Regions:
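Sec/Tat signal peptide C-region and signal peptidase I cleavage site
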Residues: 23-30
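Extracytoplasmic small-molecule ligand-binding "clamshell" domains
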Residues: 31-107
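Periplasmic-binding protein-like
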Residues: 48, 125-132, 195, 199-242, ...
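Ligand-binding cleft/hinge of the Venus flytrap
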Residues: 54-58, 71-80, 157-174, 202-206
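Short helix-initiation/N-cap motifs at beta->coil->alpha
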Residues: 68, 83-94, 136, 153, ...
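Short helices/loops that flank or line small-molecule/ion binding pockets
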Residues: 76-77, 85-86, 90-103, 117-119, ...
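Flexible hinge/capping segments at coil-to-helix
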Residues: 133-149
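Ligand-binding clefts/hinges and TM-proximal coupling segments of bilobed small-molecule sensing domains
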Residues: 160-173, 242-276
């Protein structure tokens, strides 16, 4: 009898561990899409100091921009409220991985290195890195191969500088306005960022006549929505909505609001959002 009791106790313990393990496995594989819908809100990491992608509106004090309009469209598709989480380039992925953000919609370039730690949607924007320099400076990119160049921490531009110009001195800043201040003060001889961000930055600068954007590209880059690794259901919804925005013409309308001919940083739209 004692042997039987011991056997039953061992079996019950094993079943308990199995059940607990099953619960833990289920929790580990929790569907973030379902969690977002249950919470009724999607938290989106976006910029608040990088116009025209994301910046503070001086009148409303709301974050507005190209990325914000896409975030609004995604929240509408999910059927939940939108909560914007202000970020800078270096904090984008940590916010996502820590659960403080559900999505990254913050001008984040798709790279193999980043794709190892987060998943990316199909690109919803295509851009390139350029240089902003004093108006009387050299016009060729290679003329800055040994210069002091400002970049934003955690960006592909920062990485591209080290690869393209290993003899340059790269100084990193938390955001692009700080980099521009360094350029004004003569601490750096050039700064680099996405072409569209530089155009928006220069358009708003009171001393814009003192600077110019060099025509050559440091790199060509595709921008996607960042999703936590393995959240396939959420990623599929994001991709479906991005493609739908293109098909309905709404993606082009959003682009025109921020980059159209009437804007401070006009640029022709040379891409389409396509399923991959």
């Amino acid at each position: 009898m004692a042997t039987h009791k011991k056997h039953y106790h061992t079996l019950a313990l094993a079943l308990g561990l199995l059940t607990t393990g099953g619960l833990l496995s289920t929790q580990a594989l929790a569907d973030q899409l379902a969690d977002i819908k249950a919470a009724g809100v999607v938290k989106v990491a976006t910029f608040d100091a990088n116009p025209p992608f994301g910046s503070i509106d001086a009148k409303t004090h709301d974050i507005v921009g190209y990325d914000v309009d896409f975030a609004k469209a995604l929240a509408k598709k999910l059927g939940v409220k939108l909560e914007l989480v202000a970020t800078n380039p270096a904090n984008r992925i940590p916010l996502l991985q820590s659960g403080k953000a559900d999505l990254i919609v913050a001008d984040i370039t798709i790279t193999p290195e980043r794709a190892q730690v987060i998943d990316f949607s199909t690109p919803y924007f295509v851009t390139g890195q350029q240089f902003l320099v004093p108006a009387k400076s050299a016009d060729k990119l290679d003329d800055y191969s040994k210069a002091r160049i400002g970049a934003v921490k955690g960006t592909t531009g920062e990485q591209a500088l080290h690869q393209r110009f290993p003899q340059s001195r790269v100084l990193s800043y938390d955001d692009i306005p700080l980099a521009l201040t360094a350029l004004r003060n003569g601490n750096v001889q050039a700064i680099t960022q996405d072409s569209t961000i530089l155009a928006g930055l220069l358009a708003q600068a009171p001393d814009k006549a003192d600077f110019k954007i060099l025509p050559d590209l440091l790199s060509k880059e595709e921008i996607g929505v960042g999703v936590k690794k393995g959240e396939i259901a959420l990623l599929n919804v994001v991709n479906d909505e991005l493609v739908n925005l293109e098909k309905t013409g709404n993606a082009a309308k959003i682009y025109d609001v921020w980059f159209g001919p009437q804007t401070a940083s006009p640029q022709p739209r040379a891409f389409k959002i396509e399923a991959q």
